[in-house]
Amino acid sequence: MAGHTVVQRALPNIASGSFAQSASKTSSHTSKTSYSAVVTPPSSDGNPNVWRANHLPDGLIYIIVGGTAAAIFAFIILWYAVARYMSRRVAKKTMYETNIQWRDTPSSGLYDHGDEKELYQSLVDHSDKNDARPKKSLIGLLGGGNGLGSSTSYDTVADADMDDDLIGGGYQERFNPVQDFVPSHFPRSSLFISPTLEVAQQNQQSKSVGRTNHFQNLSVTSLPSASESSSNLLDRPERTASPERKPKAYGRYHQRNRSSVGVSDHSHSRSHSRSKSASSFEMPNVNNNNKKHGTTPSRFLNNLLEGNDDGTT
């Protein structure tokens, strides 16, 4: 080991050689320099092609669109509120006028709906225009033979118009939709017969007839003609018992009980005449019966005491 020698070589230094000099030269030549570009917009002064928006706020377009939508929405709400208020006001006014007309019209409760009201109103207008009563029907519906629409003594009185004014125009002829006159201007294309119209007229005429009878009893009464009496007899319904029998039994009951309560003057006169006739015819019958059956025991004893031996008077 002692005889061997070690030879060491040093590595070449890069920085100290020619290679280091060449590297420094290339790095100095590859460096670059950067510059920033500055753009200046043209001024709007004296230039008509540039919009002058320096004094306007940002987002002006969005503000305009939002304001337009809000205005349309507010207009719709305002229109709905005004229309609702006007409709409610018109409805209240119409209801008030309808109530006033219903209170002023006395016969508005009879015909409230449907074609019956229009038919009745057209007939009333036509009768007022021509100043004549409608033609009386030959047949009446729902018991037309009760004599409500028949002629009475009221039609023959000379001052009937004055009584009609006092009554209030309650006299009305019955209307038959089948035979009575219907105005041509009323569009009626069916053969429908309304029973409610007949019933309402029947009730109204019964009330009016009751009022007219009161005035007829106070005023002049006249006898009906032969035709009227025959028609009344035909229209009169059949009776189960004769009314002439009832006053006789009623008078006999009070006469038997010796009571004058509830007996009219006519019944008193009839009962008085019957009592006279009965007394005049009953006395001979009693004498005849006594003769037939003989004298009574009390009468026979009286005759014996008086001296009559045969026991006869």
Curated annotation (Swiss-Prot):
Residues 285-301 have a biased composition (Polar residues). The keyword DNA-binding does not apply. Disulfide bonds: none annotated. It is a single-pass membrane protein. Residues 22-48, 221-313 are annotated as: Disordered. The keyword Membrane applies. GO terms for cellular component: cellular bud neck; fungal-type vacuole; vacuolar membrane. Keywords: Membrane, Transmembrane, Transmembrane helix, Vacuole. The chain crosses the membrane at residues 59-79. Belongs to the PRM5 family. This is Vacuolar membrane protein ZYRO0A01628g.
